[in-house]
Amino acid sequence: MSKKIGIKENLYQFILLVVTNLFVGSMVGIERTVLPLLGEEQFGLASTSAALSFIISFGFSKAIVNYFAGQIADKFGRKRVLLLGWVVGLFVPILTIFAHAWWVIVFANILLGINQGLTWSMTVNMKIDISKANQRGTAVGLNEFAGYSGVAIMAAVSGYVASSYSLRPEPFYLGIGIVIIGILLSLIVKDTGQHLKIQIRDNATKNESINNLSSKEVFNLTTWKDKNLSSISFSGLATNLKDGMAWGLFPLYFTTVGLSVSQTGTIVAVYPAAWGFFQLFTGVLSDKVGRKKLITYGMWTQAFALWFILFVNSFSLWILGAILLGLGTAMVYPTLQAAIGDVASPNWRASSMGVYRFWRDSGYAFGALIAGIIADLLGVTWAIEIVALLPFLAGVYSRMRLDETLKTVAK
C-alpha cells in the first residue's frame, strides 16, 4: 500500500512520535533543577563557570551530534538513529547516580547531548517527513510542545523529589524508567523513509544542482551563504544561548535571593512549561501568518522577559517573567524549524536541519560558558542582564535580513 503525506493520513504514527518526544524532553527535565545545585552542594564547586561545565559539555556534544544526525539519518534511516539515541541515554542516569567526581557528571552530560541530538532530531525530521508543507509549523509545534512539556514536568518532579529525599540518587531513578519507555516506543514507531521518497519525488525539479548538494555546501548555505537559512541559524543560536544561561543561573539566582529549592524548581519548571504549552498555538499560527513576524517578535519577547525577571522582586512576578520567557521562546522554536523546512529541499532538508540544530544547540554551551565567566567576574545578575542583549539583537537582525519563507504568505 502506497504511503500518503499528511498528519491526518498518518495520525497513529504522528501521535506515537509526539509521545516519544515527551520522554525525550523528560531526560533533560530531570537535570534542570538538580544538577546546578548538585555541583555546589555535593561536589563543592565554588566557581560558577566550573559548576556550569556540565551544560557546556551537553551543548557541544548535542550540537555536534545534531550536525551528523541529519546526514546519518539520510543514509541509514530515521528509526535506527532514534533507537541508537535511546540506547546511549541509558548510561546517563546510571553514571550520574554512581558519580564519584564532577568529571563523571560532565561525561554523563556528553552522553545526554548525544541522546538528545539523536532522538529529538529524529522526532522532528520524522514528523516533517509525514506532514504536508502547510502543516510543518503544526508538526514541529506539537513535537516541541511534547518535548518541553516533558522538560517542565520532570523539572518540577525532580525538584520535589530532591527536596523530599536528596539531590542524588532518587531523582535519577526516574531517568532509567524514562529510557526504557523511550526504547519501547521507538521499537513500535515505523520508519518514514517511504514518506520522504514521496516528498523528494513531488519536489523534483529540472535544476538538479539545487536538490543534490554536498555536506559542505549544505553547511555553508545554512551557516552564512543563504540569507534566510543563516538568519534562522543565528536566531536559533541566540535562543539557546539564553536557555543555556537560564538553565545554569536560574537555580543559583533564585536560591540566592532566598527562595527554597521547591520554589526555585517551580519557576524553573514554569518556563519550559509555558514554552511547551504556547507551542501548541505558535506552530499552527506560523502556518497561517508566516514565519518572520513570530521569529522577530519572539526574540524581542525573550530579551524583555529576562530584564523583567531582574527588575521585579516577588515570587508571583518571577512566575510571570518565566511565562513570558516561555512565550517568547515558543514563538520562535517551532517557527525556525518550520522555516528551515520551507527553504531546504527534501533531499538535503535533514542535513540542513542538522546544521541549524548544530548552531542552535551550540548556544547551550556558549550561553553557559559566557554566563559562567560573567557571573564569576561581575555576579549572576549582570550575567543574566548582558546575555539578554543577544536575543534582542537577533530580533533586529531577523527584522532586517529574513524574508518571509512561507510561500502562501510571501505571495
What are these regions (language model features)?
Residues 1-11, 194-232:
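Juxtamembrane intracellular "pre-TM" segments in multi-pass secondary transporters
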Residues 9-59, 228-231, 235, 239-257:
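Helix-loop boundary and gating motifs at the non-cytosolic
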Residues 58-67, 151-152, 272-280, 364-365:
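Residue-level signature of mid-helix packing/kink "hotspots" within the transmembrane helices
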Residues 65-77, 162, 279-290, 375-376:
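Helix-to-loop junctions at the C-terminal end of transmembrane segments
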Residues 77, 98-103, 290, 311-313:
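Helix-breaking motifs and short loop linkers at transmembrane-helix boundaries and internal kinks
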Residues 80-94, 293-308:
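Structural signature of the two symmetry-related core transmembrane helices
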Residues 110-149, 338-339:
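Cytoplasmic helix-loop-helix junction between adjacent transmembrane helices
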Residues 170-187, 384-399:
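Symmetry-related core transmembrane helices of the 12-TM Major Facilitator Superfamily/SLC fold
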